[in-house]
Amino acid sequence: MLVSARVEKQKRVAYQGKATVLALGKALPSNVVSQENLVEEYLREIKCDNLSIKDKLQHLCKSTTVKTRYTVMSRETLHKYPELATEGSPTIKQRLEIANDAVVQMAYEASLVCIKEWGRAVEDITHLVYVSSSEFRLPGGDLYLSAQLGLSNEVQRVMLYFLGCYGGLSGLRVAKDIAENNPGSRVLLTTSETTVLGFRPPNKARPYNLVGAALFGDGAAALIIGADPTESESPFMELHCAMQQFLPQTQGVIDGRLSEEGITFKLGRDLPQKIEDNVEEFCKKLVAKAGSGALELNDLFWAVHPGGPAILSGLETKLKLKPEKLECSRRALMDYGNVSSNTIFYIMDKVRDELEKKGTEGEEWGLGLAFGPGITFEGFLMRNL
């Protein structure tokens, strides 16, 4: 399902040589999951009648704040592959069979939306950065996407695999570096994710699988990144600077392993606290790169990958942010769930809408943040154009 995007009117001029976001598109699978109906439908399809699990899932569905998600996995998928809902079944082959095709198709659809908004020919794309934690094969989805879009066989490709929730901003950082160091280049960045690899029947020994069932969704996003926009292009965000760091000795807090049954995840209960304890210093380092000591955190617009609602609440409290500052992150979580690497761009799309409504009163500077395995912090200082 393609999601329409539109061209924004430029309000400020980008600094010479700085990478900008020239267009953004997204795509979602056709299967819509309403959180209100999830519990009964999910348990019925996987043939689970455990009342304790039902109660826990109902509680999680309310606490995640998610209202709607989109998934590749459907009733038809489970009927075709019933072993996906069978405990202990070696199903990695079937999962990859579904996921490999699905992630490229969603990336293709998001790219079409993005390229249409951009308004230039596909032949003008010089580089491709392809991000996914949901497929595994050689050659990778970057090659299949290039062929499907009709990109030049000399397009310069980069793949980023299995980064999780911070993958979108990592891809954006790589795209920024490419754009700023290759004059005239235009970089297509795509992110595409599906929960098919991690779908598991509920088990009391694996409580995190229920969190996944209540929180995660599927989808794709695509952006065109380039420096020194032409008259025909309409940049809406300048990528002023990027920063990444990991927290030492936290490798086990977010743990994912590929097995014969798919991907298994473990999430430490101390994740929100670890982020809260370290986020203020990280943000202040980024803000300092704006070259203005007068900027306060509440002077900025914010695009924060939510992970889950506890991370947003902790960050808001720690940084003393006004409630409206994280509204776009909360609405994206509500509308799509946690869509891993895509989520930051769904939020950025909502931020774009809000800044357009504010017009000249909109904030000039903002922060983009995402957190993932490592624990890795990925951040951007951005400028509203």
Curated annotation (Swiss-Prot):
Origin: domain of life: Eukaryota
What the entry lists under CDD domains is as follows:
CHS_like
Pathway assignment reads: Secondary metabolite biosynthesis; flavonoid biosynthesis
Location of the active site: C165
Tell me which UniProt keywords the record has, alphabetically: Acyltransferase, Developmental protein, Endoplasmic reticulum, Flavonoid biosynthesis, Transferase
The EC number(s) attached to this protein equal: 2.3.1.-
GO MF entry, a single one? acyltransferase activity, transferring groups other than amino-acyl groups
Location(s) in or outside the cell: Endoplasmic reticulum
Q: Where does substrate bind?
A: G217, D218
The kind of enzyme this is, by top-level EC class, is transferase
Which of this chain's residues are annotated to bind CoA? K56, L57, Q58, H59, L60, C61, K62, S63, L267, G307, G308, P309, A310
Cleavable signal peptide: none
Q: What does the entry list under GO cellular component?
A: endoplasmic reticulum
- One BP term from GO: flavonoid biosynthetic process
The free-text function statement in the UniProt record for this protein reads: Plant type III polyketide synthases (PKSs) that catalyzes the condensation of malonyl-CoA units with various CoA ester starter molecules to generate a diverse array of natural products including long-chain alkyl alpha-pyrones.
- Protein family according to the UniProt entry: Belongs to the thiolase-like superfamily. Chalcone/stilbene synthases family.
- Quaternary structure? Homodimer.
**This protein's name:** Type III polyketide synthase C
Q: Which organism is the protein's source?
A: Arabidopsis thaliana
